[in-house]
Design a protein with these regions (language model features):
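Acidic/His-rich segments in extracytoplasmic proteins that coordinate ligands and/or metal ions
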Residues: 12-24
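Cap/insert and terminal regions of metallo-dependent hydrolase folds
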Residues: 19-20, 30-32, 36-39, 106-201
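Core dinuclear metal-dependent hydrolase active-site scaffold
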Residues: 50-117, 203-216
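Helix-loop-beta element that forms the nucleotide-linked donor phosphate-binding surface
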Residues: 40-51
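Short, flexible loop segments at the rims of nucleotide/cofactor-binding pockets, characterized by
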Residues: 9-12, 75-79, 99-102, 138-143
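Metallo-beta-lactamase
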Residues: 5, 90-101, 120-126, 186
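Single conserved hydrophobic/aromatic residue that forms the stacking wall/gate
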Residues: 1-11
Length: 216
């Protein structure tokens, strides 16, 4: 998604190693992170760790709220859940974007929808859900939504549009690699969305937040 003027970059969690983080440009940028991850950004000038429901006002038009997700954190055998995980709600110029990082489905999204909805645009994972027999089901994962669960979350958030992400880049699970976007599109109407408001992008494809959010 192209950068909107005044709206900074959101880096989807890519299991970044410390070397990659050190090589990011713009060391004077404001960095917003879940709790206990600031140690990886020591060379940055403005690092802000956030607990669930913390809000940070970046400027007069931009506010970010860190919200719960149904997931976990782990980088080694000894640090399970030692850092926080979650979703970012970005409020910009009167519009709301929910950037759902890795998450499973849960009732928390009904609560988030009641408190913060309606959401204008939701980004949510739709792939990496078949880990059978490591997990008991072939079609769902506790920590990654399948396409239908992603749409149910977007429905609970009262989202106007939803973008499916976290699919088709790396083979992490056993579902066919092109299954998530097909199911995502096919299930749109069932969850109250027009097909044109359920969006899928190819690797390297660009779009404009201004267009997606309906800014004139």
């Amino acid at each position: 998604i192209q950068r909107s003027r005044g709206l900074g970059d959101v880096y989807k969690r890519q299991h970044q190693d410390a070397y990659t983080i050190r090589k990011f440009p713009y060391k004077d940028a404001k960095v917003l992170l879940p709790l206990k991850l600031g140690k990886y950004f020591r060379r940055y000038k403005d690092v802000n760790e956030m607990d669930w429901y913390d809000e940070i006002k970046v400027n007069e038009k931009l506010k970010v709220t860190f919200l719960p997700a149904v997931h976990w954190s782990k980088r080694s055998l000894t640090d399970t859940n030692k850092t926080l995980w979650g979703n970012f709600l970005i409020e910009y110029d009167g519009k709301k974007i929910l950037f759902a990082c890795d998450t499973g489905i849960g009732d928390i999204y009904k609560s988030i929808g009641q408190k913060y909805g309606p959401i204008d645009l939701t980004f949510i994972n739709i792939g990496a859900y078949n880990f059978y027999p490591i997990m008991p089901y072939k079609d769902k994962s506790i920590y990654h939504t399948n396409p239908e669960e992603a749409l149910e979350i977007a429905q609970n958030l009262k989202s106007k549009k939803v973008v499916g992400m976290h699919w088709g880049t790396f083979v992490l699970s056993l579902e066919p690699i092109m299954e998530p976007p097909k199911r995502f599109k096919a299930s749109a109407n069932k969850y109250g969305f027009k097909k044109e408001d359920v969006l899928i992008y190819k690797i390297g494809e660009f779009d404009s937040l201004k267009k997606l959010l309906g800014h004139n």
